[in-house]
Amino acid sequence: MDNAFFCNSGCEANEAAIKLARLYGHNKGVDQPAIIVMEKAFHGRTIATLSATGSRKVQAGFEPLLSGFVRVPYDDVQTLEQVATHNKTIVAVLVEPIQAESGIKVPPDGYLAKVREICT
């Protein structure tokens, strides 16, 4: 590892990840980079992380939100792979290892490994 980024909160870390993903996309020639996010996810309360969040209740009142996020079900590897394969604007996947905003949701064994495989 050549670099490390320290921040004060998960929200700040997610905000930086979103910015880096978009920058990566622009550097690769993608005009409108998109990030796959999961339904019922929570990523923070900045405008970018609210836009990535999968809870309409949390987003309410803060519109217009940012575009560039594609939602898929949390533990549905087939849908994730289909979207990642067929949408050429996808530059990243933002996923919580364990979802907690809508109740504790642990992914099935092998899910995160498969997500990583799709990304590489």
Give the predicted meaning of each segment.
Residues 1-92:
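PLP-dependent aspartate aminotransferase-fold enzymes
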Residues 64, 97, 107-108:
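Proline-rich low-complexity regions
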Residues 70-73, 101-105:
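Short acidic-aromatic active-site loops that bind/stabilize oxyanions
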Residues 87-104:
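Short acidic, glycine-rich surface-loop motifs adjacent to enzyme active sites
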Residues 105-120:
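Catalytic PLP-binding core of fold-type I/II PLP enzymes
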